[in-house]
């Protein structure tokens, strides 16, 4: 009887530790950070969208997404990057024309 209680206690502790490990691992899901910025020119016609990296990242970045699904990290302070973001915003959310 004592060994059955010990076995149940061990299984309970093992199950609890697996739950904690699984929950801790899930906190980083979906977080993408840039380590460096791309310095070259990016043709506008190859871009499908953009997003800003999480505030949890050490380096603030704008990430452009290409038609092939690639992510390109860019400096949000760069003038070309700002113009590209404005362009993408204008084609994604066109301003209604007055009649």
UniProtKB/Swiss-Prot annotation:
Pfam families: IL8. It comes from the Eukaryota. Belongs to the intercrine beta (chemokine CC) family. It comes from Felis catus. Expressed in thymus and also in spleen, lung, lymph node, kidney, small intestine, colon and skin. Residues 1-23 form the signal peptide. This is C-C motif chemokine 17. PANTHER family: C-C MOTIF CHEMOKINE 17 (PTHR12015:SF111), SMALL INDUCIBLE CYTOKINE A (PTHR12015). One of its GO terms (molecular function) is chemokine activity. It is found in: Secreted. Chemokine, which displays chemotactic activity for T lymphocytes, preferentially Th2 cells, but not monocytes or granulocytes. Therefore plays an important role in a wide range of inflammatory and immunological processes. Acts by binding to CCR4 at T-cell surface. Mediates GM-CSF/CSF2-driven pain and inflammation. In the brain, required to maintain the typical, highly branched morphology of hippocampal microglia under homeostatic conditions. GO terms for cellular component: extracellular space. GO terms for biological process: immune response; inflammatory response. Disulfide bonds join 33-57, 34-73. CDD domains: Chemokine_CC (cd00272). Keywords: Chemotaxis, Cytokine, Disulfide bond, Inflammatory response, Secreted, Signal.
């Amino acid at each position: 009887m004592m060994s059955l209680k010990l076995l149940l206690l061990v299984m309970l502790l093992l199950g609890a530790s697996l739950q904690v490990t699984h929950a801790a691992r899930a906190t980083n899901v979906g977080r993408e950070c840039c380590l460096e910025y791309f310095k070259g020119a990016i043709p506008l016609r190859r871009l499908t969208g953009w997003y800003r990296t999480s505030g949890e990242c050490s380096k603030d970045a704008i990430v452009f997404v290409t038609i092939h699904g690639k992510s390109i990290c860019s400096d949000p302070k760069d003038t070309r990057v700002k113009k590209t973001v404005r362009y993408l915003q204008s084609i994604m959310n066109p301003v209604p024309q007055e009649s």
